[in-house]
Design a protein with these regions (language model features):
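N-terminal pre-Walker A segment at the start of P-loop NTPase domains
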Residues: 1-14
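Conserved Walker B catalytic segment
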Residues: 8, 113-165, 172-174
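Conserved catalytic network of the ASCE P-loop NTPase/AAA+ motor domain
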Residues: 14-18, 42, 105, 114-120, ...
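P-loop NTPase nucleotide-binding core
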Residues: 21-22, 27-123, 135-139, 185
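Conserved nucleotide-binding/hydrolysis micro-motifs of P-loop NTPases
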Residues: 30-31, 54-58, 163-168, 192-196
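Short, aromatic/basic amphipathic alpha-helical patches
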Residues: 36, 40-41, 171-179
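Conserved beta-strand segments of the P-loop GTPase G domain that flank and frequently precede/overlap
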Residues: 51, 159-162, 188
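Conserved small helical "lid"/interfacial subdomain of P-loop NTPases
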Residues: 181-214
Length: 215
């Protein structure tokens, strides 16, 4: 499959009538997975996105997801207190004030997911670069947490993005056990996009494709 088919995968997943709740997009580094995904999700709401590369805790992962959902910004480093302060929890605001620094991004995320669940609206959560997850993060616990969100909220859609060939033990065994239970479909990206639709001219397309081949 070519990289320029990734938008079709996202649209299919993000459809209320889709049979999928969780899919994986896998491809070699530099083939254009993240490029296509980031270009596509600018037009989608609500979307939570986190690249696991360089993230050192589960709390930080969900902090980045929450930040993207609430403020629609992309930052490599997230101030969790800033995230907590930015989230309007309505009737739960007094609880947030009582908890103070103990307040968890995951608590706020679950509140937001519940709001969309009650409205019957899809919310898409994207976890990129999962093969680069830090050794400081409990991979089994992370995947189990994502699975529990899927079980609790049927309108949550999950997109995992990775280079599966770069999974090594013990993460490989953990992932294989998890994916058999939860991932509905794995899409393998084997070719670069023929064109990059967000760029205006063939010259720009050619330049971008050449850049992606080298990175």
């Amino acid at each position: 499959m070519r990289a320029d088919k990734i938008p079709d995968i996202i649209h299919q997943l993000n459809n209320i009538n889709s049979p999928y709740q969780c899919v994986m997009i896998s491809g070699e580094w530099g083939i254009g997975k993240s490029f296509q995904i980031n270009a596509e999700i600018h037009a989608l709401k609500p979307v939570g996105y986190c690249s696991l590369f360089g993230v050192d805790s589960i709390e930080d992962i969900f902090g980045q997801i929450l930040f993207r959902l609430t403020l629609n910004k992309n930052k490599s480093r997230i101030n969790l207190k800033q995230v907590a302060d930015a989230v309007d929890l309505g009737k739960l605001e007094p609880i947030k004030r009582i908890l103070g620094n103990v307040f968890s991004p995951q608590m706020a995320l679950e509140y937001i997911l519940n709001q969309y669940e009650q409205k019957g609206k899809i919310i898409l959560l994207i976890f990129d670069d999962i093969e680069r997850i830090s050794d400081n993060v409990d991979f089994d616990l992370f995947l189990g947490t994502v699975e529990s969100l899927m079980q609790a909220y049927r309108y949550v859609k999950i997109l995992f993005v990775a280079n599966l060939s770069q999974f090594y033990e013990p993460q490989r065994a953990i992932w294989e056990n998890y994916s058999e239970k939860v991932v509905d479909q794995i899409f393998h990206i084997e070719d670069l996009a023929k064109n990059i639709s967000i760029l205006e001219t063939p010259e720009y397309n050619a330049t971008a494709l050449e850049f992606m081949k080298k990175h």
